[in-house]
């Protein structure tokens, strides 16, 4: 039974439907999550521009619905204008709601830092323009992006249809391109990565920080609930 004192975690998700990403129920089955959807049309800078100004309004909606903390669960949506913008967006959400707020870009940074990663191989769903912006964001934050392999997807629905074997192969190619990396960043919150993470870590011997699992891990930590993630989904979630 859910403790009535357990903080509700609010999530702003890029797709239109107000659905909590499936990773939440697998990783933290006892925690309460709620969501509101931005209705982003494409995984491109133009798609981000169309919805970014509504993020703060969605944060306020989640507060009205009882959220105690809020996460913007979009990686590229929060890094595409750079590190300073990610911080400013987080501050704007906090100022409007008075609640602790975070973003998925902050989550992956926190995950990489928790694992003492300095040099990171990039495995992404994105087109080249977005990959370049991700590399620049990581460099601004003091990390060394090392190589990149990507799927070149722009469709929101297509992200969720990428299968586990494709994700594992993508990560293998990323580490082959940058074999001296400390970890792999598997970037895009729309990818279903939970089953790929343990296989990649077993095969390659390096940790994987993936957008959506890291987003849940970070939001739960911010909420201060003390809940632990379900086991078997990689080093970060087992830390």
Describe the role of every protein-language-model region:
Residues 1-57, 129-131, 135-163:
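N-terminal glycine-rich anion-binding loop in soluble enzyme alpha/beta folds
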Residues 153-158, 204, 208-228:
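Short, flexible loop segments at boundaries between secondary-structure elements
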Residues 169-200, 216:
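Hydrophobic alpha-helical
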């Amino acid at each position: 039974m859910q403790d009535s004192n357990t903080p509700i975690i609010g999530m702003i998700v890029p797709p239109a439907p107000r659905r909590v990403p499936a990773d939440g129920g697998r990783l933290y089955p006892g925690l309460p999550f709620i969501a509101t959807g931005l209705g982003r049309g494409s995984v491109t800078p133009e798609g981000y521009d169309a919805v970014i100004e509504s993020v703060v309004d969605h944060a306020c909606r989640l507060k009205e619905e009882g959220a105690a903390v809020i996460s913007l669960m979009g990686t590229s949506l929060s890094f595409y204008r750079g590190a300073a913008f990610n911080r400013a967006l987080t501050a704007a959400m906090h100022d409007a709601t008075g609640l602790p707020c975070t973003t998925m870009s902050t989550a992956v940074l926190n995950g990489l830092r928790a694992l003492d990663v300095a040099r990171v191989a990039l495995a992404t769903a994105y087109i080249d323009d977005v990959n370049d912006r991700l590399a620049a964001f990581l460099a601004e934050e003091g990390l060394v992006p090392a190589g990149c392999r990507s799927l070149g997807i722009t469709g929101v629905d297509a992200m969720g249809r990428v299968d586990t074997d494709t994700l594992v192969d993508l990560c293998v190619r990323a580490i082959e391109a940058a074999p001296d990396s400390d970890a792999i960043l598997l970037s895009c919150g729309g990818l279903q990565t939970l089953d790929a993470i343990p296989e990649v870590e077993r095969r390659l011997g390096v940790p994987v920080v993936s957008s959506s699992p890291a987003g849940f891990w970070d939001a739960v930590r911010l909420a201060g609930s003390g809940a632990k993630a379900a086991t078997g989904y990689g080093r970060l979630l087992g830390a």
